A protein has these predicted regions:
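N-terminal cap/lid segment of alpha/beta-hydrolase-fold proteins
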Residues: 1-36
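Short beta-strand/loop motif that positions the catalytic acidic residue
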Residues: 184, 190-192, 196
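Active-site nucleophile elbow and catalytic-triad environment of alpha/beta-hydrolase enzymes
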Residues: 166-180, 185-186
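C-terminal catalytic histidine-bearing segment of alpha/beta-hydrolase fold enzymes
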Residues: 212-259
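Conserved alpha/beta-hydrolase "acid-adjacent" motif
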Residues: 197-206
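Catalytic nucleophile-loop/oxyanion-hole region of alpha/beta-hydrolase
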Residues: 52-60, 72-111, 236-241
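Primarily recognizes the serine-hydrolase "nucleophile elbow" in alpha/beta-hydrolase
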Residues: 97-162, 172-173
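Short beta-strand element of the alpha/beta-hydrolase
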Residues: 38-47
Length: 259
């Protein structure tokens, strides 16, 4: 199926405030389907935790809505002198809770929620399906039903330690999904390009092994010839490839009955 990027870019979302922190409003942007949805896909942008915005994944969220799901793109606090990934994770947890509430109010039912994240956003997407990490933020938070991890960061103990202001080994491991997998975590689709020079493919394989050891259902799909951030339009790959990959993910989620 050909994905019409231009049409997706011309689709406008509804904006919702999900929390206010120190006077700063944080928003999520929702695209609604024309039919009764089976599920919701929450898209989380990358940018190394220091740049980019929710708008980056508007076309992807709009596509999920076009295919019958509620598509959402969320913003979160970027790292700064006073914030790190713990703040961003707190925001993402708050956003999921607010989105679930909105979905129930709008449709009168609960539905599967999928976290879909690219790179640094993949980190947050994975965290949202990880029981230990979510409970550190909110004891009452229910993890997402499924995770789509697109070349996501899973280990803060090496080159990605800058994501956390604390550099103690204990804290770095506590906020690394790789070291916090447990039985009952959300089933996961891991997708990683074999030409990724930003987040090492080996990290995806290590995470797959960690999930396997704990009996967490998952699929690891290695994309031949794909570089980092292969899901972004107008970036490293041509838009035909990006669209085909997005359509494949959508079909995969439909096959799993999440959307």
């Amino acid at each position: 199926m050909k994905v019409d990027k231009e049409r997706l870019e011309n689709t406008q979302p509804l904006r919702f405030t999900y929390r206010t922190e120190n006077g700063q409003e944080l928003f999520y942007y929702a695209f609604f389907p024309s039919i009764e949805p089976k599920g919701c896909v929450i898209c989380i942008h990358g940018g190394g935790w220091t740049s980019d915005s929710a708008k980056r994944l508007f076309p992807q969220a709009a596509y999920f809505a076009e295919q019958g799901a509620v598509g959402v793109s969320i913003e979160y606090r970027l790292n700064s002198e006073t914030t790190d990934v713990r703040n961003g994770l707190h925001d993402c947890v708050s956003a999921v809770k607010a989105i679930r509430k909105m979905l129930f109010e709008r449709y009168g039912k609960e539905m599967p929620v999928v976290s879909f994240g690219d790179s640094a956003g993949g980190y947050y997407a994975v965290c949202l399906g990880n029981q230990k990490m979510v409970k550190r933020i909110d004891e009452n938070m229910q993890i997402v039903d499924y995770v789509v991890d697109l070349n996501g960061i899973v280990d803060l103990t090496g080159k990605w330690s800058y994501g956390l202001s604390s550099k103690t080994q204990e804290d770095l491991q506590d906020y690394s999904p790789l070291f916090n997998v447990s039985a009952g975590d959300a089933p996961t689709l891991i997708m990683h390009g074999d030409q990724d020079k930003t987040v090492e493919l080996e990290d995806a394989k290590r995470y797959s092994e960690a999930l396997q050891k704990k009996g967490v259902s998952h699929d690891l799909k290695i994309l031949a010839g794909a570089a980092h951030a292969f899901i972004l339009f107008d970036y490293r790959h041509d838009n035909i490839f990006v669209g085909a990959t997005l359509a494949w993910i959508c079909d995969f989620l439909k096959g799993k009955q999440y959307i």
